[in-house]
Amino acid sequence: MADCTTLDSLLEMGFGRNRAEKAVAHTGNQGIERAMDWLMEHENDPDIDEPYVPPAGNTLGPAEEQSQSPTEIPESIEDTEEGNARQPMTEEERKEQVKRLEDLMKARQEERRERERQEGIEREKQRRKQGQELLQVRQKLQEDEMKKLADQRRKEKMEDRLAKQRVKDKIARDREERAQKFGGGSSSTGLSSPPAEAPALSPPENQGAPPAKKDYDDCRIQVRLLDGTTLSTVFKAQEPLAAVRVYVQMNGANGQDFNLITPYPRRVYTDLDMEKPLRELGLVPSAVLVVTKK
């Protein structure tokens, strides 16, 4: 009888009765190999060791009636090759069958372990591939960010150079305009000088003439830097204060932003003051400016 032989074989191999009965029932009594496959596939089921409860109207054998027990033999599955009844196996035959089934089970387990090993290798390959792709994405983002920062710095440096160049160009234009203005007016000053000597007979009035001599064309500026060192140079009296600022930027500011002040009387020069001539700011003929942090 096929079902009893399968169940007995599983029990002899050491499987629990509940597991063996479930394997026989769920495989439809289709042989020991199918039952063993089912046991290996479901060995981790939480209810694998619970008693088997057949569904309503069914028992362990698919062709059995409810009145039959799992050990009863249905007439429809009698062994036609051996006659009307299956001869019981001898002890030696039973041991050989158990050994064969154990070898089969070991082979199936080895196949499953190999399959799981291959699946593990594939999962590890996929994990490494995903890790490499993620690393490449991060590197690309970092490279893009560094490139963006470098472009921004180049842009800022270019804008700074252009701003300094505009100031230099303006200073050059102002110098040229002053040169043309004062160069053309020198003759008229020479022509008007003789009448200025006419009131020489009245000494009290001549004493008011010296203020006219204070109309200096040059201005000496001394600048005290943040580190205590000083810069000193000469500017035209009509040059704007921006010329002094550019001079400091090019010779001692070290790229820092700063203010220009006069210590006494104390005055902090603003951006509007940068366009005013040194004469108008009272820095002629000489002055001391101090650099302070902005």
From Swiss-Prot:
This is UBX domain-containing protein 1. Residues 89-159 form a coiled coil. InterPro entries: UBA, UBA-like_sf, UBA_UBXN1, Ubiquitin-like_domsf, UBX_dom. Ubiquitin-binding protein that specifically binds 'Lys-6'-linked polyubiquitin chains. Component of a complex required to couple deglycosylation and proteasome-mediated degradation of misfolded proteins in the endoplasmic reticulum that are retrotranslocated in the cytosol. Involved in ubiquitin-proteasome systems. The UBA domain specifically recognizes and binds 'Lys-6'-linked polyubiquitin chains. Residues 1-42 form the UBA domain. It comes from Danio rerio (Zebrafish). Pfam families: UBA_7 (PF22562), UBX (PF00789). The keyword Manganese does not apply. One of its GO terms (cellular component) is cytoplasm. Keywords: Coiled coil, Cytoplasm. Its main location: cytoplasm. CDD domains: UBA_UBXN1, UBX_UBXN1. It is found in: Cytoplasm. Residues 89-125, 140-180 have a biased composition (Basic and acidic residues). Residues 42-215 are annotated as: Disordered. Residues 214-291 form the UBX domain. One of its GO terms (biological process) is negative regulation of proteasomal ubiquitin-dependent protein catabolic process. SUPFAM superfamilies: UBA-like, Ubiquitin-like. One of its GO terms (molecular function) is K6-linked polyubiquitin modification-dependent protein binding. Residues 188-205 have a biased composition (Low complexity).
